[in-house]
Amino acid sequence: MRQPFEEYKGKFSSKTRSTLNRKIRKYTEHCGGSISWKLYKSAGEMPEFFQLARTVSQVTYQEKLLDAGLPDSEEFRREMDQLAQQGHVRGFILFYQDIPVSYLYCPVVNDVLIYAFLGYNPSYMNFSVGTVLQWLALEHLFAERCFRFFDFTEGQSEHKKLFATHHIQCANVFFLRSNLRNRLLLHSQRIVDNFSKLTGDKLDQLGLKSKVKKMMRFGI
């Protein structure tokens, strides 16, 4: 992340850059001509970030379906405060007027930003507020010139594929005893994985995958 932001933008095709610019322009117009967002990084700023981010997190599919929202615990708040005192955290909030609509929380480990918690209010989904905030945050972080990488962590998503520049293979490895029970479990897991992949591929071919995802996440 110590290269200029303009150089990073060069990794996108002209079509993708046009799409991103269109999304930002659409949200700018929705906001009346200018986008309101805020960076949080000091210990004095993080309580405000936490309050606003929790307002968003509690309505996200990450929290409702995956139990992966911004933790609402004293332990997390203490950890966040400690990181802020050391300068090892960045938080971002995107607003519509004075309403928080998306958030991004990134602790810093060895000069690497970790894509830890994020979410957006589904009521603003049509304005791509998650993508807009990610773009604005990256632009700012490149300008800071303080970090080596932005780690999108493990897992696959279109969002990560869009913004990442590199990837590495990673896996969770389990050692199991060779017995009938474990073999049946592994076989069942393969069946489920294959069915999921085949279903996803078929929905993708039919142009229905994104619609089904929205139905599962947001009930629409």
Where in the sequence are the language-model features?
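A conserved beta-strand-loop-helix scaffold within acyl/acetyltransferase catalytic domains
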Residues: 2-126, 218-219
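Active-site/acyl-donor-binding loops of N-acyltransferases
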Residues: 1-6, 148-207, 212
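Low-complexity, flexible helical/coil segments
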Residues: 7-8, 30-33, 71-77, 91, ...
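Glycine-rich loops and low-complexity Gly/Arg-rich segments
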Residues: 19-25, 61-65, 118, 129-131, ...
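Acyl-donor binding region in acyl/amide transferases
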Residues: 110-169, 174-175
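A general structural signal for short secondary-structure boundary/capping elements
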Residues: 19, 42, 84-87, 140, ...
